[in-house]
Regions:
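Extended two-metal-dependent nuclease catalytic cores across DNA- and RNA-processing enzymes
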Residues: 1-180, 184-187, 191
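Short, amphipathic C-terminal "tail helix"
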Residues: 194-196
C-alpha cells in the first residue's frame, strides 16, 4: 500500500461519512482535531464525552467534559488546571514540545537531553504568574509551550472557522444508513443499526 492509496482511502471514507452518516464531520484548515474539539466543547456549552487516550484533553475537563480512554478501557481523571500547568512547564515529549528549561531543538537534536525540572519546583510554581519565576529564556519557552499546548490559546480566526463550519455542516439522514450498509454488504452493522 502506498501513501497515495492511504490518502485516497481516507478521502473516500470522509466523503462517505459526510454523505451517509448522521454526524457532523469537520475538517478546518490550520486546525488540528484537538482544536476543533476544544472550540466545540467551549462554545456549545453542552455535556461532552471525549473518546480519546490523549491526556491533552484533561485541560478541558473543567467544561462539563468527561473523557474515556479506549486504550485503557477507563475514564480519564485529572485536574484541568494542574494538567495544563504541568504540560506548560514540563512540555509534552509525545507532541515534540520541550520543557521550559530547554530550547526548541532539544528533542530533535540527537544525543541531547532536556534539563530536568524537579517536582518540587513544579508544585511551587503552580498558580503563580510565570513572569514571577521565569528567567527571560524560560518565559520565552513558557510562551512557546502555551501557544502549542493551551487549548484556550487557539487563534481567534481558527475558532471562528471551526464554529462557522460546525453551524453550516449538514448531516446525512439516519434513515439512509440501512441503504448504505446493504449496498456495502455490512451485515453485522445492519444488525446493529440502532447503535448508530
Amino acid at each position: 500500500i502506498t501513501w497515495n492509496d492511504l490518502y485516497e482511502s481516507l478521502s473516500l471514507m470522509k466523503a462517505e461519512l459526510a454523505e451517509w452518516f448522521p454526524y457532523k464531520l469537520l475538517q478546518v484548515d490550520e486546525a488540528e482535531a484537538d482544536d476543533i474539539i476544544a472550540v466545540l466543547v467551549k462554545t456549545l456549552g453542552e455535556r461532552a464525552l471525549i473518546l480519546s487516550s490523549d491526556k491533552d484533553f484533561i485541560q478541558l475537563h473543567q467544561f462539563n467534559v468527561v473523557q474515556y480512554s479506549p486504550m485503557q478501557k477507563k475514564f480519564v481523571d485529572g485536574d484541568a488546571k494542574w494538567s495544563l500547568h504541568e504540560k506548560l512547564i514540563k512540555g509534552d515529549v509525545g507532541d515534540g514540545v520541550p520543557n521550559i528549561l530547554s530550547d526548541d531543538s532539544v528533542l530533535v537534536d540527537e544525543g541531547r537531553r532536556q534539563r530536568p525540572i524537579a517536582s518540587k519546583k513544579l508544585s511551587e510554581w503552580f498558580g503563580i504568574a510565570p513572569e514571577l519565576f521565569c528567567t527571560e529564556e524560560m518565559l520565552r519557552n513558557f510562551n512557546r509551550n502555551k501557544q502549542l499546548i493551551d487549548l484556550n490559546d487557539i487563534p481567534e480566526s481558527i475558532c471562528i472557522n471551526i464554529s462557522k463550519q460546525y453551524r453550516e455542516t449538514i448531516v446525512g439522514e439516519r434513515k439512509r444508513l440501512l441503504t448504505y450498509f446493504i449496498n456495502h454488504r455490512l451485515k453485522n452493522l445492519t444488525e446493529n443499526l440502532s447503535e448508530f
